[in-house]
Structures are given as structure tokens and as C-alpha cells.
Amino acid sequence: MLDFNKIEPEEGKLDLDLRCVNYDLDDKSHLRYGDWVTFKSHSSKKVRISRPESPRGENSDRQPQDADYPSLSYELESEILARFPRWEYWKLSLVNKRCSMLLKSGEIFEIRKENGFKEPSVYMLASGETNWWTFDREFKSRRKIPDLPSDVCFTFGDKESLCAGTHLLVSGREIDGLVIWRFELATNCWYKGPSMVNPRCLFASATCGTSVFVAGGVGIMANSEVYDTAEKYNPDSRSWDLLPRMKRKRKLCSGCYMDKKFYVIGGRNENGELTCGEFFDEGRNKWELIPDMLKDDPVLTCHSPPLIAVVNNELYSLEASSNQLKLYMKKTNTWKMLGQVPVRADSNRGWGIAFKSLGNELLVIGAASSSASYSGNSMAIYTCCPDPDVIELQWKPLDSGRNRLSSFILNCSVMVA
């Protein structure tokens, strides 16, 4: 009889020593070596439990050691480890060489993708820091990722960040020009490139699954014109592909992915501020203009790009001048006020604020409002499940200022893998 004393079902949790396995088995008591096990997942994989081979042909009843589980096939072991919380994956390199290679090759993330496992984490660069930090979803744990090996110009210059699958892309300027540095979660290392077809800054971006879209922006030359070009990044090939040109040239714009379309909103060009938006329909391979999408937004001098995020396929905006959260009404092309957020977006005209989607919640990070419990200059972190029908939204504070990082956020991206 197969011993499952160390394999107990527990939803959503798997300890590294394999004492907890997220099986969906109806009856473990009748399983024997040679039986097939079906995982109730998107891929409904079926694997065989094999009996370990005893040394010198002996029929040993010894228990497997801490990091040695010969009774599990490689396929079954991989399926189990894929259910392990992604935040703890760094421990795999301490188990054995095969587990380490499962992580570094990226195979474990492919298994997670096939089975529909998704877990968000937040990557952030705060003012006064030269290192990026990554946080788990609840901001209960954080880790400093390796130093980005660029030059001083890139380190202290303006940067833009975006996530595509398990890649964190950071765009900025080195002494020789615009570059992109790529952090790969699997290897925990930085790599240079690939550069965009049209290198740019001050652009809009949005993530869709494992791909990322960029549009608009401007080059770094003094006489560079504002772009109407767009591109799509494929993390599998580590390459950029050109998309059709937008209807309007724009820089300092914002992007999001909603209704299976890439939206680009606001910004400015040679003629001034833009209140229109537009979206790219990948199925039709064309852009459509949305006039007056931001017509009621007050125009501030030197303001940030629009602060927008999509949760449950609904578009939300944080108005920098009033700290008001707004919901976009698709049918009427108008915005509905939902109340104030607990951070000060108005203190720096929207700059230094992180406003992101985090699963089915909104995430906002910045300087706390006067009514908040945070003190000093440490960042305030809040999440909220937005509901257009409630009178007052309930914002949940996270971290309680323990991290002591600056409240001015230079870059922030959410990785879902």
C-alpha cells in the first residue's frame, strides 16, 4: 500500500518537504504503486506512482530522507512543486540539483501556466533606493533582487517598468542611449535587451497574459518627434514585433488591457494635451479612436500620465488633482466618482504614486493622507475590492509602514505567474 502519511490534501498550500500536497484525489487509501493518479486541473494530467528501487535489490522499508523522494516520478514531483507557493521558489535550489534546474530552466513556470496557476507579486523601486524590491501579494514578505548591472546614467535616470510573464523589463537611458534591462524570475538574474524596434521613453504600456504592449512616447534626441508607433513583446522569443500605427501621436500617455483590447489614454503631443483615447483590436489589427475620453479631467502643469488600472475588466482612474477614484462608464464614455483614496496623489501632481491592479483588487502606494495611520515619510500601502454600487469603498492597509521605504515610488509593476 502506498504510504500517504506525509501527503495530506490542503487547498492552496504545499510545504517544501512535501508534507502537504495539493492533490485532488477521491480515495487515497486504495492507491498502490503502479496506480495512475489524475490531477483535477486544467490539463487533467495523469501520472503513475512508481515504487523506488532498493539498493542491491533489497526490499527496504526505510523512509526517504529530507530532500530525497525516490518514490515519486519526476513528472509527479514537478506537478507537486508547481503547486508550491511561488514566493517560496527560491528554496528549490536548496533541495537538489533537479529541483534547482526545474526552476532555472523555467519548466516549473510552464507547468503552472498549463494548469492555470497564477500568483501576483509586486516589483518596486522607491526614491533613494538603487535596488529593486519584490513583495508578496499581502506585503508580509519582501526580498531585494540582485543589483541591476547598468551604468550611473541608467541608475539615477528616469525609468519605466513593465512585466511580461516571468520577465520584469526596465527601460531607461544609459550613456550610449536607450536600453532595456530584463530580470528573469527563473534564473534570478538581469540580462540586457532586447531593445524595442523604436527605442522610446514616456510611453504607454499594458500587460496581457505573458505579452506586453507599448505605444507612443518619444526618442531621446533633442529634436525627436512624438511617436505614434506601437510594439508587442513576446517573452518566449525575447523579441519585439511592430504593430500598426496609432491614430494620434502621443507621449506621457497611459495604457491598459480591457475587453481583449490594448487601450492608450491621454498624453500630449506637439499640439498640447490630449483628451482622447484609442484602443488596438488585435483580432482586427487596427486602432479605433475614443473622442473626449478624458474631457472632464482638470489639466495640471507638469502632471503625471493618467493613473489608471483595470480590475474585473473595469477601468478605474485616480484623479491626481483631487485624490478621487473614478470608474469609467463604457456605454456613456463618462466617469463615475467613487470617493477619495487614502494616499496623497495631489502632493506631486500624480508623480510618485503606484496605482495598479492586484488580482481582483486595486493597489495604491504613496504618501498617506492626513487621516491615515501611517507616520513619517514611509510608504502607505492599501488595497480595495472596488464596487461601483457601494456608498463608501473600504480600503485595507497593508504592511503598516514596517518596510520604511520612501513614500515616493519611482517604478512599480505587478508580475502574475
PLM regions: where:
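Conserved short beta-strand element of beta-propeller blades
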Residues: P70-S71, E110-S127, S150-S171, I180, ...
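Beta-propeller blade signature
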Residues: T134-R137, V179-T187, Y227-S237, T275-R284, ...
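Plant regulatory low-complexity segments
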Residues: L307, T334-W335
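Short active-site-adjacent structural elements
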Residues: D346, V364-I365, S371-M379, V390-L393
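Skp1-binding F-box subdomain of Cullin-RING ligase substrate receptors
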Residues: D3, H30, R51, E58-R142
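WD40-like beta-propeller blades
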Residues: W335-P342, D389-R402
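CRL adaptor-proximal regions
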Residues: M1-S71
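A structural motif specific to WD40 beta-propellers
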Residues: R143, Y191-G193, D241-L243, E288-I290, ...
